[in-house]
C-alpha cells in the first residue's frame, strides 16, 4: 500500500465508490499519529515529502460521508504531520524541499548529476502544491470542527506558501510553472502535468488556469507526465509516458475550467487505453500508446481505476462540492453528446440518479424529482433524488492555436576541465547556443563552448550551463564551484560519543542512535565573521538509492547551538559503505571572530521514517565562506 496511491485514488473517486475500504486504506497509512511517507529516493522521508497528499483523500472521504469523527481524526493526523515536517525544514524557508510527488525514479526525470542529497535540498512544484493544498484543507477541516483560531493559522501558512510558489516557480519566459528549482536556485522549466492540474483545481493558478491547461503539451495518446522528455532516457516510465490517473486530474481541471475540447482529449486518452488493454494499466508509452514497452506496469491499478471513476463523477457529470451543497456542473464534449446516466450514487444520506442529455457545459433546464429546480442539492438532503439535466448546445469556441506537441530536451552539458578563469564545456549535439548562470542568475550567453570569467569574484561563485536551440533546452549542468583562495576548508572529525569520550580513528566515524555514537565533535576552527555553508562527507548504504526508509538525519550544532538538521540520504547501493558523497549545505551565520566548534548529534528531531535504523559513516566537514 502506498500513501500517495491511496490518497490520489480517494480524491479521484474511491471515496465515493468504496468509502469503507477508502477509510481503512487511509487509516493504514497512519503510524504514531502521523502520515507515513512512502519509501523512495535516498531512503524516503524527508527526501520525499509528498505524504501530505493524504489530505486530499481524507477531505474527499469527509465530503462524501459527512463523518465528523473522521474529520477530527484526519485534522489531528495532518497537524501532527506538518509539525514533524517543520522540525527538519531549513530555517526561514516557506517552500517545502523534497523530490517531485510520484515522479520518484531519479534517473527518469532529474538531471544526471543530482544525488539524493541534491534532490532532498531541491524544491518541487508538485510537492509544494500538495503542501499548499494540505494547509488549505486542514484549515477547512478545523473550521468545520469549530476551531477558527487554528484554522486561521493554517490558512495564513497556505497563503504565504501560495505567494512563494508563484514567486519561485512561475516562468515569465514560458508562461507556465517550472517543474523544480534546485538548491542552487536554478528553475527547471519543464511542465509537470499533475502539478499543473492540481494548481488549477485548488485555485492556486488563478487567472492563468485556462491558458495553462490549453497549452499543456500533448502526445498522440495523451498528456505526458512531464515535458520535454529526458532525451538520454529512452525507456518509458515517468519519462515518455502517460499515466491515466494524471490524465484524470488533468481532465477534472479542464472540466472545472469548462474546457470541453481539452476534456475530450483527456477522455479519449483514458477510454482508448482501457479498451485497448482490457484493463486499467498504470501507464503507457506516450508516443506509441503501447503498455508493453514501459519499464514497469500492472493491470487493475488502483489509481488508474479511480481515474476512470473520476472521468465520470467529476469530469462528465461535473459533481463537486460548494459550501454545504452538492453542485452538478457537467462537461460533455460534442464528440460525447447524447444521454448519460449515473444511477445509485450514494453521497451522505442521499442516493442520486443523474441523467444528462445533450452536450456542452451550460445547463438549459434542471428537473429534480420531476420538478423544475437548480443543479444545487443541499448536502443534508435525504432519500433517493432523481436529477434530469438538459444541456444547452454551444457553438465551438474560436479555434485556438494547437497545443504544443511533446518534445525531447537536449542533453545536459558536461564540463571540459573548467578553471576559475575560463569555463569550458563539451559541445551538445543539437545546441544552437548556451546560457551561463552564476549563483542562480543569468550571467552570459555563448555560441561557443567557453566563457571567460571576471577577475574579481568575491568569496564564492557557482556556475552552471544550459544548452538551448529554437525548440527546446537542456537541464542545467552540474554546478562548477569557484571558492576564493582560503575560502574553503576541510575540518577533521575528532571525538565521538555521548560526551565525546572516544577519539576518532582513521578520519571517519560510524554514527547511529546508540549513546556511544550519538555525537561527533570536529576539531575547533578559527573563523572570521560572515556567512558560511557547511557540508559533510558521508556514506549511507543502508539500502538502495531508489528505495527504503532509512535516510539518516543529524542535527548540526555550531558553538553548541542548533544550525539545522542535515539530511544524509542513501548515496549508493546497499552495503557499499566505502562509497562517500557530499551532503547538501546548511547555511550558518558566524557573528564573531575566533575559534568555533561544530558537532553532529542525534536528537529527537532526527527520528527518521524507519524509527530504528538511522545510521551513516562520516568524514570531514566542508566549510565554505559565502559572504
Label every model-predicted segment.
Residues 1, 20-45, 90-123, 163-243, ...:
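Extended glycan-interaction surfaces of carbohydrate-active proteins
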Residues 219, 253-422:
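Non-catalytic C-terminal accessory modules of carbohydrate-active enzymes
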Residues 364, 433-436, 554-556:
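Short beta-strand elements bearing conserved aromatic residues within extracellular beta-rich modules
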Residues 420-430:
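Conserved aromatic anchor
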Residues 479-627:
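Extracytoplasmic
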Residues 453-474:
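Beta-strand-rich modules
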Residues 441-448:
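Short beta-strand segments within Ig-like beta-sandwich modules, predominantly Fibronectin type-III
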Residues 2-6, 10-99, 103-104, 111, ...:
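Aromatic-rich carbohydrate-recognition surfaces in CAZymes
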Amino acid at each position: 500500500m502506498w500513501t500517495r496511491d491511496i490518497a490520489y485514488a480517494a480524491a479521484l473517486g474511491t471515496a465515493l465508490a468504496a468509502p469503507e475500504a477508502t477509510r481503512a486504506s487511509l487509516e493504514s497509512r497512519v503510524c504514531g499519529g502521523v502520515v507515513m511517507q512512502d519509501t523512495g529516493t535516498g531512503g524516503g522521508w524527508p527526501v520525499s515529502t509528498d505524504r501530505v497528499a493524504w489530505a486530499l483523500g481524507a477531505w474527499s472521504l469527509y465530503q462524501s460521508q459527512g463523518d465528523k469523527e473522521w474529520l477530527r481524526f484526519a485534522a489531528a493526523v495532518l497537524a501532527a504531520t506538518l509539525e514533524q515536517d517543520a522540525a527538519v525544514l531549513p530555517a526561514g524557508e516557506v517552500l517545502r524541499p523534497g523530490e517531485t510527488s510520484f515522479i520518484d525514479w531519479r534517473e527518469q526525470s532529474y538531471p544526471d548529476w543530482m544525488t539524493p542529497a541534491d534532490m532532498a535540498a531541491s524544491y518541487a512544484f508538485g510537492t509544494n502544491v500538495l503542501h499548499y493544498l494540505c494547509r488549505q484543507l486542514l484549515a477547512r477541516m478545523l473550521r468545520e470542527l469549530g476551531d477558527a483560531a487554528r484554522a486561521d493559522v493554517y490558512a495564513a501558512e497556505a497563503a504565504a506558501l501560495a505567494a512563494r510558489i508563484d514567486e519561485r516557480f512561475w516562468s515569465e519566459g514560458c508562461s507556465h510553472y517550472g517543474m523544480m528549482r534546485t538548491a542552487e536556485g536554478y528553475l527547471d522549466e519543464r511542465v509537470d502535468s499533475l502539478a499543473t492540474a492540481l494548481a488549477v483545481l485548488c485555485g492556486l493558478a488563478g487567472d492563468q488556469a485556462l491558458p495553462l491547461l490549453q497549452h499543456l503539451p500533448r502526445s498522440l495518446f495523451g498528456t505526458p507526465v512531464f515535458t520535454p522528455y529526458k532525451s538520454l532516457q529512452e525507456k518509458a516510465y515517468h519519462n515518455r509516458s502517460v499515466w491515466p490517473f494524471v490524465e484524470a486530474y488533468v481532465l477534472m481541471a479542464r472540466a472545472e475550467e469548462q474546457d470541453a475540447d481539452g476534456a475530450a482529449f483527456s477522455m479519449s486518452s483514458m477510454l482508448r487505453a482501457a479498451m485497448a488493454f482490457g484493463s486499467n494499466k498504470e501507464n503507457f508509452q506516450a508516443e506509441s500508446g503501447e503498455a508493453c514497452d514501459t519499464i514497469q506496469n500492472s493491470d487493475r491499478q488502483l489509481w488508474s481505476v479511480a481515474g476512470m471513476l473520476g472521468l465520470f463523477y467529476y469530469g462528465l457529470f461535473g459533481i463537486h462540492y460548494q459550501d454545504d451543497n452538492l453542485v452538478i456542473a457537467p462537461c460533455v464534449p460534442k464528440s460525447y453528446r447524447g444521454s448519460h446516466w449515473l444511477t445509485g450514487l450514494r453521497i451522505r444520506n442521499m442516493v442520486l440518479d443523474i441523467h444528462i442529455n445533450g452536450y456542452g457545459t451550460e445547463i438549459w433546464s434542471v428537473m429534480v424529482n420531476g420538478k423544475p429546480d437548480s443543479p444545487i442539492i443541499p448536502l443534508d438532503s435525504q432519500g433517493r433524488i432523481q436529477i434530469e439535466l438538459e444541456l444547452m448546445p454551444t457553438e465551438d469556441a474560436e479555434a485556438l492555436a494547437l497545443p504544443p506537441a511533446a518534445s525531447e530536451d537536449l542533453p545536459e552539458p558536461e564540463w571540459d576541465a573548467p578553471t576559475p578563469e575560463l569555463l569550458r564545456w563539451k559541445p551538445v549535439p543539437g545546441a544552437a547556443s548556451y546560457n551561463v548562470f552564476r549563483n542562480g542568475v543569468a550571467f552570459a550567453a555563448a555560441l561557443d563552448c567557453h566563457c571567460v570569467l571576471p577577475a574579481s569574484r568575491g568569496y564564492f561563485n557557482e556556475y552552471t550551463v544550459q544548452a538551448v536551440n529554437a525548440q527546446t533546452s537542456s537541464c542545467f549542468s552540474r554546478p562548477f564551484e569557484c571558492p576564493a583562495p582560503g575560502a574553503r576548508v576541510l575540518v577533521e572529525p575528532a571525538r565521538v560519543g555521548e560526551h565525546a569520550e572516544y577519539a576518532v580513528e582513521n578520519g571517519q566515524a560510524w554514527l547511529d542512535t546508540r549513546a556511544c555514537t550519538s555525537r561527533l565533535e570536529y576539531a575547533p576552527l578559527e573563523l572570521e565573521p560572515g556567512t558560511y555553508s557547511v557540508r559533510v562527507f558521508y556514506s549511507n548504504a543502508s539500502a538502495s538509492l531508489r528505495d527504503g526508509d532509512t535516510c539518516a538525519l543529524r542535527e548540526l550544532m555550531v558553538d553548541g547551538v542548533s544550525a539545522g538538521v542535515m539530511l544524509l540520504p542513501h548515496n549508493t547501493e546497499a552495503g557499499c559503505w566505502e562509497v562517500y558523497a557530499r551532503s547538501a549545505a546548511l547555511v550558518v551565520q558566524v557573528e564573531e571572530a575566533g575559534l568555533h566548534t561544530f558537532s553532529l548529534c542525534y536528537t529527537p528531531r532526527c527520528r527518521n521514517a524507519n524509527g530504528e535504523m538511522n545510521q551513516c559513516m562520516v568524514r570531514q566537514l566542508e566549510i565554505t565562506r559565502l559572504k
